[in-house]
């Protein structure tokens, strides 16, 4: 299923569910996705109470620990290529930046200016193993999942644009569809976009029958076993 097979409204419908629920729904619809395709490492979430975000990945790599070796003109050309890549392709987007330094996050590529620029270019959020800063001036509504918070930008600059990157254990290519919230991010197969809301509601229904017993008076192992037995008989 290509992007023409679903609408922006279909994508936005997925933001009604947190990322763990989307992961569960993916397992229901496509069991082969279980165990991979999501972030697996610790991160800092900028806005834990913000609703989930979804968008098409724009990828790049940065460095910040040492000065670059490109001429000023060549570095400016690479910067321009980077911004063009953010502005090219389907939107909304999520920006996925891999910091290649041995100590990722030595300098922050991201702050007040970059967050504002990327909102202007149609991005809804950021995943980076690098660092961010300027938290009080950060663009409203732009989520981030980052490796750390930093004070300085040091020598932060893009060193490559596009292709495959790895952030928090997740391999991402430009154009991948990502769902993210304070728990992390998961790649969403486009063919499953329209089916995911119903699958998510089915998962919630299954869990509610167990939670009703667990949270009710007189919960016992036998009551729980019977509830699980009922689910097994249905599903």
Residue ranges of model-derived segments:
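Intrinsically disordered, low-complexity regions enriched in acidic/Ser/Thr/Pro/Gln residues
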Residues: 1-76, 80-89, 206-219, 225-226
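Extracellular/luminal Protease-associated
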Residues: 84-128
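Buried hydrophobic positions in well-ordered alpha/beta secondary-structure cores of metabolic enzymes
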Residues: 26, 118, 176-178
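A short secondary-structure junction signal
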Residues: 72, 107-110, 129-130, 137-140, ...
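General beta-strand structural signal in soluble alpha/beta enzymes
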Residues: 36-38, 96-98, 126-130, 144-146, ...
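Short coil/turn connectors at secondary-structure junctions
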Residues: 54-55, 90-93, 121-124, 139-142, ...
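Ligand/cofactor pocket segment of small-molecule handling proteins
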Residues: 115-136, 141-150
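Acidic, glycine-rich flexible loop/linker segments
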Residues: 147-223
């Amino acid at each position: 299923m290509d992007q023409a097979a679903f609408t922006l409204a279909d994508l936005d419908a997925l933001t009604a569910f947190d990322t763990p629920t989307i992961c569960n729904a993916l397992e229901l619809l496509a069991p082969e996705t279980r165990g991979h395709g999501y972030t697996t490492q610790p991160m800092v979430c900028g806005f834990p109470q913000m609703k989930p975000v979804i968008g098409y990945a724009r990828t790049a790599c940065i460095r910040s620990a040492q000065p670059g070796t490109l001429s000023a003109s060549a570095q400016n050309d690479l910067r321009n290529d980077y911004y063009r890549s953010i502005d090219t392709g389907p939107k909304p987007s999520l920006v996925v930046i891999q910091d290649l330094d041995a100590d990722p996050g030595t300098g922050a590529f991201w702050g007040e200016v970059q967050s504002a620029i990327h909102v202007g270019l149609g991005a809804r959020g950021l995943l980076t193993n690098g660092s961010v800063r300027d938290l009080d001036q950060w663009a409203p509504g732009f989520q981030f999942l980052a490796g750390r918070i930093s004070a300085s930008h040091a020598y932060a600059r893009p060193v490559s644009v596009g292709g495959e990157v790895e952030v928090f254990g997740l391999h991402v290519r430009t154009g991948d569809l990502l769902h993210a919230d304070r728990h992390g991010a998961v790649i969403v197969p486009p063919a499953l976009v329209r089916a995911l809301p119903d699958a998510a509601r089915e998962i919630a229904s299954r869990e509610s029958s167990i939670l009703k017993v667990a949270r009710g008076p007189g919960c016992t192992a036998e009551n729980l076993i019977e509830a699980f037995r009922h689910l097994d008989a249905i599903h």
